[in-house]
């Protein structure tokens, strides 16, 4: 399939990984597949291809894992004691506690109650349990939280309404959209305030259509390759979420990712409405994500951010791949960034000042993220 994927980033990534890690500079196709397979087997048997050595070869300063609030952090504790030079920090992912409308919610709340030591009878108890787990994650070096939302919601409700929705969910009853949104808004604002108090970074991912193919979902389950972009009305709600937090001086450092590139420009104008003179680039437009994680998608995100914001304050690329070879995607990003900046210079839109340009590239690709995540 790979030779037919002309223009697809998978073609670029695969060849970058083969070159950077395995020293293979040929083309992967049906004729070379056995040669590449044999080379990979030979290399992977060598000590320098251990997981830690692959990370060392990529010069990784920090890895942020994705962790459920109920995690006991056992392996993080072992890693911290092992002396591994790359920081491996947990990231708080409380989606299961917020997804009141999804199956398995009641069982998850019982698990959260056990992990936190909080008897959970209502929504305020869920908030207290999450606060307890946030405090624990903080002791383990957590620097960021991540919220995966189908869309951004903002619907205020009374505690009586929110508790009624919670009770219905715990009893296995269906909830209306308004009930789901009131509960999720309450907990999103609560968690964001906790992040702000600790100097964490809040990441919000949205505009994803999950499991549209019911037949495939029934056969293979979630996260099996059938999700897609969504058109969502998240703009007004996100403004209101951020305004509610800013009003109370509880807006944390925030990175926003939309799966729909049509959202790029309004996101980039939103950044300017909530920036801070104390933290350069406090509110970030996250790097082109998932379906946009390709040459054109990256160029479009970078161009929109440059046109409407300050590209020099951007915290740059991340890879959320589970592959230890995926750090090659950072090189992919750097190539695209430098090509774009070089085009602007050649067009006379920026001086050919190599010292300034070099410093900008270093900041976008490394230094800004180090400062932003307090590394």
Regions inferred by a protein language model and the residue ranges of each:
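Divalent-cation-assisted or electrostatically stabilized phosphate/pyrophosphate-binding catalytic cores
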Residues: 232-238
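A short acidic, glycine-rich active-site loop
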Residues: 177, 226-232
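Hard-cation-handling environments
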Residues: 208, 213
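Metal-cofactor-binding active-site regions of metalloenzymes
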Residues: 1-198, 249-252, 256-268, 272-375
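Short glycine/proline- and charge-enriched loop/turn segments
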Residues: 217-225
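C-terminal amphipathic alpha-helical interaction region
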Residues: 202-204
């Amino acid at each position: 399939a790979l030779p037919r994927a002309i223009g697809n980033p998978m073609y670029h990534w695969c060849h970058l990984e083969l070159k950077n890690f395995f020293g293979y500079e040929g083309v992967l196709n049906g004729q070379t597949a056995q040669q590449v397979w044999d080379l990979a087997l030979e290399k992977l048997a060598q000590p320098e291809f251990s997981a830690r050595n692959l990370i060392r070869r990529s010069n990784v300063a920090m890895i942020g894992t994705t962790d459920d609030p109920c995690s006991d952090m056992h392996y993080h504790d072992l890693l911290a004691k092992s002396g591994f030079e790359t920081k491996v920090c947990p990231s708080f992912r409380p989606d299961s506690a917020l997804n009141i409308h999804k199956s398995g919610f009641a069982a998850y709340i019982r698990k959260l109650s056990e992990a936190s030591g909080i008897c959970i009878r209502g929504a305020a108890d869920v908030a207290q349990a999450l606060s307890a787990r946030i405090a624990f994650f903080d002791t383990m070096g957590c620097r960021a939280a991540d919220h995966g939302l189908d869309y951004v919601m903002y619907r205020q409700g009374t505690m009586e309404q929110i508790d009624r929705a919670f009770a219905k969910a715990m009893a296995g009853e269906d909830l209306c959209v308004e009930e789901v949104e009131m509960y999720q808004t309450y907990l999103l604002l609560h968690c964001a305030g906790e992040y702000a108090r600790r100097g964490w970074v809040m990441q919000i991912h949205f505009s994803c259509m999950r499991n549209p193919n019911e037949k495939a979902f029934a056969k293979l389950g979630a996260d099996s390759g059938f999700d897609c972009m969504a058109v969502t009305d998240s703009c007004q709600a996100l403004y209101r979420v951020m305004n509610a937090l800013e009003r109370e001086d509880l807006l944390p450092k925030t990175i926003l990712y939309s799966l729909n590139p049509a959202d790029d420009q309004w996101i980039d104008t939103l950044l300017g409405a909530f920036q801070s003179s104390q933290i350069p680039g406090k509110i970030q437009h996250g790097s082109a994500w998932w379906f946009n994680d390709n040459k054109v998608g990256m160029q479009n995100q970078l161009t929109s951010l440059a046109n409407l914001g300050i590209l020099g304050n951007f915290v740059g690329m991340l890879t959320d791949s589970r592959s230890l070879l995926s750090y090659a995607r950072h090189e992919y990003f750097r190539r695209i960034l430098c090509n774009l900046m070089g085009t602007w210079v050649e067009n006379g839109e920026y001086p050919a000042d190599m010292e300034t340009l070099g410093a900008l590239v270093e900041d976008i690709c490394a230094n800004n993220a180090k400062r932003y995540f307090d590394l």
